[in-house]
């Protein structure tokens, strides 16, 4: 094709002719059989392509280079006879006379730091009983998400996890762990089972480039939003990153253990950008997979130097094939899309349709961040809040409107929200309760499309935010009764709202990062889950636990019915109090005929009128488990504690 400038490449890639002549719908990557392995690589602009063979995934010489044969649609392939399980390889792809050695972008395993790809018999990586592993059945009423980083989960020495497994996939498989091994205070998987969350959302577990797997991890840390290989797990989370099959097997063992505990696994996927410009996709088809400005330079809507061109046919195929692979091979239960606003609506809906076609695929969750990290050259409908009505009803969005209404803006540490007493914010809290289905702030949507939350890995933890609002110089490790009450109030609001409830791991035990608002590469010590705080703040943990169970006992809050929020009846109360009632849906198995809920963000007790009838106190400002016993019933009026969410059930 001759030497081309980036601008010329852009014109070529966006031409109908290129799409027509190069779009390929078949399998790519390694296809293993005991008799031999076929490698297939899509590289339509390449003049030559060859495979380089290695015995090891690092520090070993090339033992041979073989040419690939070009076929239709620009697919290059080669048949390697014999059992190739455990063998490593790279490609050398020549474009415009420049030869680049690269890993296989379609590889399913790799060596140290993912620099070399690996051929695997995937059946040999499956743990015992894997063929019987199935996705837990989690009805909408029980859906809730607990977000955690693999390292954070268990790297605390007090976690009770065996030292070799701390910060690893295998930490999720160890049962019966307790704080310092005391046999009393549960940690890790033991803790999760007791907490009662429906899903664990794992921050990036695919192979990323910001941690060197060849070096000790003692001082290394990164969240992992730096993809290098999309289709196999990160090696630093395995017990042996040099052996490519180990990370695959141990990741499956983690998922199997969570499934056995009745917990679904949601994977945080970051297709929107790659770690560096020199990457497996760009080395194979320069500039094709990344959105370009008119002059051919890279668009940077991710804020990371590049952004994925989801609208280009083979980029869309790459992303959807990857999702399907994780869902099928690893039994993933859901996907959280980082910077989902960088994908076009058509790609997201096509991904939903592809997952739906799998056995049980309609139960796989999809939701993401409906924003971008900068200006983008995406000139199609973006998968953002403004286009929510164009997305499939089973694609959700993180709702920053809910987050900011409850706890205050995330970019100003001292800006209060409703829980901290911000004047006028009660209007937005009403919108949040209804999942914004009764507001013109968002296009028409189902309540289940709204991810209701107040904290995630980005920005301040809820505890740190509450203290920053209250104090000019907070003492983050000190206990604070008012902040604790405000924490309970914040949880009480989003856990009694329509939508999908979501919390950052440790929010329920006042997790602190000591005021660090972006800890993506801070120390392991700062980022770890401090399991001693789960003991210290056990009453707060129990408050979350009780609300999660209470929510499950009133299924209408988790409904997918877009008309359900219309049944909410809001009360006329003295500002800034908020109160509402919601009847149970007929035949949904609710424990109570209706819920009546009040929020009081003030520092004084308040008396409020109750609707007609008898109302059992289910949860007040300190205990969310009153409904489990013979709690008091009320008629006509009730007293609200300061900084409280109070829940009644009609009896």
Residue ranges and their predicted role:
Residues 1-34, 70-174:
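The feature marks proteins involved in alpha-glucan
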Residues 109-158, 397, 401-479:
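Glycine-rich phosphate/pyrophosphate-binding loop
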Residues 35-39:
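Structural beta-strand segments of beta-rich domains
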Residues 41, 91, 148, 202, ...:
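Conserved, mostly hydrophobic/aromatic
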Residues 444-616:
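Loop/helix patches that line or flank the sugar-binding groove of alpha-linked glycan CAZymes
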Residues 151-330, 336-359, 365, 376-377:
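Substrate-binding/active-site clefts of carbohydrate-active enzymes
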Residues 64-70, 218-219, 224-225, 339-444, ...:
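Active-site-proximal helices and loops of the catalytic beta/alpha 8
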Residues 43, 86-87, 630-651:
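C-terminal beta-strand-rich structural cap/linker in extracellular carbohydrate-active enzymes
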């Amino acid at each position: 094709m001759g030497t081309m400038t980036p601008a010329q490449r852009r014109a070529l890639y966006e031409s109908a002719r290129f799409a027509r002549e190069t779009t390929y719908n078949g399998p790519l990557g390694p296809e293993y059989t005991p008799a031999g392995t076929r490698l297939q690589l899509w590289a339509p602009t390449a003049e030559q392509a060859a495979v380089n063979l290695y015995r090891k995934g690092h520090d070993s010489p090339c033992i041979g280079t073989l040419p690939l044969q070009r076929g239709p649609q620009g697919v290059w392939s080669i048949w390697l006879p014999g059992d190739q399980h455990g063998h490593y390889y790279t490609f050398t792809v020549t474009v415009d006379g420049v030869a680049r050695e690269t890993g296989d972008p379609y590889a399913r395993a790799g060596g140290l730091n993912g620099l070399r790809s690996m051929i695997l018999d995937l059946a040999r990586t499956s743990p015992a009983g894997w063929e019987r592993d199935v996705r837990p059945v989690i009805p909408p009423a029980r859906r809730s998400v607990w977000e955690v980083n693999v390292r954070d989960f268990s790297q605390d020495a007090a976690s009770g996890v065996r030292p070799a497994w701390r910060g690893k996939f295998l930490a999720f498989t160890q049962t019966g762990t307790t704080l310092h091994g005391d046999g009393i205070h549960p940690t890790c998987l033991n803790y999760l089972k007791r907490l009662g969350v429906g899903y664990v959302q794992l921050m990036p577990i695919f192979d990323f480039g910001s941690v060197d797997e060849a070096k000790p991890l003692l001082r290394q840390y990164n969240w992992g939003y730096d993809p290098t290989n999309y289709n196999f797990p990160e090696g630093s989370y395995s017990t042996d990153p040099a052996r490519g099959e180990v990370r695959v097997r141990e990741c499956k063992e983690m998922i199997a253990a969570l499934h056995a505990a009745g917990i679904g696994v949601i994977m945080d996927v970051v297709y929107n950008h790659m770690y560096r410009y020199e990457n497996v996709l760009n080395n194979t088809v320069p500039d094709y997979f990344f959105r370009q400005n008119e002059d051919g330079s890279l668009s940077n809507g991710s804020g990371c130097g590049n952004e994925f061109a989801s609208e280009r046919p083979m980029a869309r195929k790459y992303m959807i094939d990857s999702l399907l692979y994780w869902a099928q091979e690893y039994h993933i239960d859901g996907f959280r899309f980082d910077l989902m606003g960088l994908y076009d609506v058509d790609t997201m809906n096509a991904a939903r349709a592809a997952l739906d076609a799998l056995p049980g695929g309609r139960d796989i969750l999809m939701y993401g961040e409906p924003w971008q990290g900068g200006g983008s050259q995406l000139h199609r409908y973006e998968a953002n809040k403004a286009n929510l009505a164009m997305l499939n009803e089973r694609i959700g969005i993180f709702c920053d409107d809910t987050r900011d209404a409850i706890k205050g803006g995330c970019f100003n540490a001292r800006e209060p929200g409703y829980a901290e007493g911000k004047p006028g914010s009660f209007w937005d809290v009403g919108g949040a309760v209804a999942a914004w289905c009764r507001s013109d702030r968002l296009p028409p949507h189902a309540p289940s499309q709204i991810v209701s939350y107040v904290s995630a890995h980005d920005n301040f933890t809820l505890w740190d935010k509450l203290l920053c609002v209250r104090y000019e110089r907070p003492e983050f490790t000190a206990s604070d009764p008012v902040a604790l009450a405000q924490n309970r109030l914040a949880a009480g609001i989003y856990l009694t709202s329509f939508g999908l409830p979501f919390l950052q791991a440790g929010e329920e035990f006042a997790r602190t990062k000591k005021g660090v608002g972006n800890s993506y590469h801070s120390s392991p010590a700062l980022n770890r889950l401090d399991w001693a705080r789960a003991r210290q703040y056990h009453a707060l943990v129990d408050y979350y636990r009780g609300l999660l169970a209470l929510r499950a006992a009133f299924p209408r809050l988790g409904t997918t019915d877009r008309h359900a929020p219309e049944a909410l009846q809001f009360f006329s109360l003295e500002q800034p109090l908020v109160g509402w009632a919601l009847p149970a849906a007929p035949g949904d198995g609710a424990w109570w005929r209706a819920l009546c809920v009040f929020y009081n963000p003030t520092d004084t007790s308040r008396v409020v009128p109750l609707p007609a009838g008898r109302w059992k106190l289910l949860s007040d400002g300190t205990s969310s488990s009153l409904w489990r016993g013979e709690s008091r019933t009320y008629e006509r009026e009730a007293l609200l504690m300061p900084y409280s969410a109070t829940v009644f059930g009609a009896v």
